[in-house]
């Protein structure tokens, strides 16, 4: 595939300074938006800048330059003095908005009011005095509001109320005290990119319908492969609807690499295939095996040590057992950042075993891949460059708005051979441009959402160094939490030693249990503590943190930090809140 030129398409220098002669990122977007959004793109740019860009001249390969501007509305005043208050939404319906005749003014007013609702929500998300969640039980919400779909349309006043109600009861995942999931935080540039992506409303299967986005996917995936350590960023990749699908892509491609005939003839034409992954790995490996007809029984779970890392000797033992039974080992999936412990499998040792037995090595770095952006922490993924494929979710540790997951493959062209179906109504071979940019045939999907723009725009805004600071801060906050609770009365660590990732796993032991002997009764009572505290957190709306059992360990808290808005004070608050809510248990 030919490489796009430097400048607008590139990420700029590592320090985030970029090329001074290039337009700013947002302005650059507005310069090209008209190519695939038409008037709507110009209107949104007008909302951003108070003016609108004229359509760029056709022809030429250079990104269009800024042109003369026109007013966004009839009044031509800043701020706009159009009589917005005269719009009575009670008498307007969706049919009164664009493309309706004379629909421009109500459309602008309606979208501005929606924007006001969104911006109020954004501001509240960072206000520590607001609740993380206004929790109601499902039956309460069902009874309080009529959520049913009707045959007749509702007016726009009711539609705006639905927008407000939906956000009122939504989780504020950007709140600095929301620690419940691996994906937290709310990045303003990423949010803006998501809005613009939805406005463009295009598909990713061919260059002709997504020219900018296809190029951005190319340069972004190439950059990610360079960071992994593949020479010159060589290889292939795709953005998929989450890490589970990325992992399934890896299984699909690994199977095709070993037995290409399976594409036409199916599983009946190949011997029984066996995949290997750690007992702490993500459940998506088994889901992928089920979906691909390999079967969950063909996924062998490898023992982990006390820190949750795969034991290489057990991996080799299980590979030999499978071969002795006449089965064919085809994939080993190592994990870089397990979901619960945040453990990193020993990738170099796993790579040696995969090379020895000629097995595809996949690294599920959905959670831990972000650490590759940090010079301080990337050593934890040493050996990832030897993998055949890597899953990396920027929507987790890097804070990109959901969804943004990439599957990176070391061998170029393999994904295309595995998945292409040559649909002639999409992938005509006599088009007038370089067909290597028609990337849709290597995807399982036909309709594919534009996920790259959020990551690309954030990268332009933050630079690699900005992501590094983000990662380092979150890891430092996890170390801060660990340093406080490791010797604090009422806390017990699930495993010894400083966490490798931002996962901090611990039990809170209420005063009533501290005097009990470490026996079955104590464990039974301790198992009920975390669920009760979590329920109280949600009912008060003060904070949220996850809990779970694992193996023979009863329910414990799993604290994860991926939101750079969090501070030491938020960690202190969490500790105090756990103690307040659990003191009487």
Curated annotation (Swiss-Prot):
It is an enzyme of class 4 (lyase). Residues 1-25 are annotated as: Disordered. It holds the Pfam family Pyridoxal_deC. It catalyses: L-glutamate + H(+) = 4-aminobutanoate + CO2. It is found in: Cytoplasm, Cytosol; Cytoplasmic vesicle; Presynaptic cell membrane; Golgi apparatus membrane. It is a lipid-anchor; Peripheral membrane protein. Its EC number is 4.1.1.15. The modification N6-(pyridoxal phosphate)lysine is found at residue 396. Keywords: Cell membrane, Cell projection, Cytoplasm, Cytoplasmic vesicle, Decarboxylase, Golgi apparatus, Lipoprotein, Lyase, Membrane, Neurotransmitter biosynthesis, Palmitate, Phosphoprotein, Pyridoxal phosphate, Synapse. GO terms for molecular function: glutamate decarboxylase activity; pyridoxal phosphate binding. Phosphorylated; which does not affect kinetic parameters or subcellular location. Palmitoylated; which is required for presynaptic clustering. GO terms for cellular component: axon; cytoplasm; cytoplasmic vesicle; cytosol; Golgi membrane; presynaptic membrane. Substrate binds at residues 181-183, 558. PROSITE patterns: DDC_GAD_HDC_YDC (PS00392). InterPro entries: PyrdxlP-dep_de-COase, PyrdxlP-dep_Trfase, PyrdxlP-dep_Trfase_major, Pyridoxal-P_BS. Its cofactor is pyridoxal 5'-phosphate. It comes from the Eukaryota. One of its GO terms (biological process) is gamma-aminobutyric acid biosynthetic process. CDD domains: DOPA_deC_like. PANTHER family: GLUTAMATE DECARBOXYLASE 2, GLUTAMATE DECARBOXYLASE-RELATED. Catalyzes the production of GABA. Homodimer. Belongs to the group II decarboxylase family. This is Glutamate decarboxylase 2. The gene is GAD2.
């Amino acid at each position: 595939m030919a490489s796009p030129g430097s400048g607008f398409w590139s990420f700029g220098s590592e320090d985030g300074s970029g090329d001074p002669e290039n337009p700013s990122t947002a302005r650059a977007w507005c310069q090209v938006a008209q190519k695939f959004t038409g008037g709507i793109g110009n209107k949104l740019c007008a909302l951003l800048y108070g003016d609108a860009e004229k359509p760029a001249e056709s022809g030429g390969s250079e990104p269009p330059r800024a042109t003369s501007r026109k007013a966004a509305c009839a009044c031509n005043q800043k701020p706009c003095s159009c009589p917005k208050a005269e719009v009575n939404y009670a008498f307007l319906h969706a049919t009164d908005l664009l493309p309706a005749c004379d629909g421009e003014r109500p459309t602008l007013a309606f979208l501005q009011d929606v924007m006001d609702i969104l911006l109020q929500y954004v501001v509240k998300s960072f206000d520590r005095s607001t609740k993380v969640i206004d929790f109601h039980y499902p039956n309460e919400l069902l009874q309080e509001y009529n959520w049913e779909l009707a045959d007749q349309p509702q007016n726009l006043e009711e539609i705006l109320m639905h927008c407000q109600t939906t956000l009122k009861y939504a989780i504020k995942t950007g709140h600095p005290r929301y620690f419940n999931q691996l994906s937290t935080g709310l990045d303003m540039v990423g949010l803006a990119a998501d809005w613009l992506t939805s406005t463009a409303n295009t598909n990713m299967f061919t260059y002709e319908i997504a020219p900018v986005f296809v190029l951005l996917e190319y340069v972004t995936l190439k950059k990610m492969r360079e960071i992994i350590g593949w020479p010159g960023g060589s290889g292939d990749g795709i953005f998929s609807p989450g890490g589970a699908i990325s992992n399934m892509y890896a299984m699909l491609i690994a199977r095709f690499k070993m037995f290409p005939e399976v594409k036409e003839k199916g599983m009946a034409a190949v011997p029984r295939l066996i995949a290997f992954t750690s007992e702490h790995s993500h459940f998506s490996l088994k889901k992928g095996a089920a979906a691909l007809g390999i079967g969950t029984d063909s996924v062998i779970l490898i023992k982990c040590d006390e820190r949750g890392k795969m034991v290489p000797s057990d991996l080799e033992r299980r590979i030999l057992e499978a071969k002795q039974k006449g089965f064919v080992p085809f994939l080993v999936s190592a994990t870089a950042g397990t979901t619960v412990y945040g453990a990193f499998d020993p990738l170099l040792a796993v790579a040696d075993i995969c090379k020895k037995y000629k097995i595809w090595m996949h690294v599920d770095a959905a959670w831990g891949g972000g650490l590759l952006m940090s010079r301080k922490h990337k050593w934890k993924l040493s050996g990832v460059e030897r993998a055949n494929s890597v899953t990396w979710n920027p929507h987790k540790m890097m804070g990109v708005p959901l969804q943004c997951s990439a599957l990176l493959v070391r061998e170029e062209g393999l994904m295309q051979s595995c998945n292409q179906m040559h649909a002639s109504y999409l992938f005509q071979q006599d088009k007038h441009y370089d067909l290597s940019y028609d990337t849709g045939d290597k995807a399982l999907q036909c309709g594919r959402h534009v996920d790259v723009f959020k990551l690309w725009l954030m990268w332009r805004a933050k630079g690699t160094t900005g992501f590094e600071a983000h990662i380092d801060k979150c890891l430092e906050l996890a170390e801060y939490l660990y340093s406080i609770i490791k010797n604090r009365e009422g806390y017990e660590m699930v495993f010894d030693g400083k966490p490798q990732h931002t996962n901090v796993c611990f039990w809170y032991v209420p005063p009533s249990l501290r005097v009990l002997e470490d026996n079955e009764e104590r464990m039974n009572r301790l198992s009920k503590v975390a669920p009760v505290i979590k329920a109280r957190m949600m009912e008060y709306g003060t904070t949220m943190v996850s809990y779970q059992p694992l193996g023979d360990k009863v329910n414990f808290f799993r604290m994860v930090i991926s939101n750079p808005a969090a501070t030491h004070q938020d960690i202190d608050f969490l500790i105090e809140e756990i103690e307040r809510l659990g003191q009487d248990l």
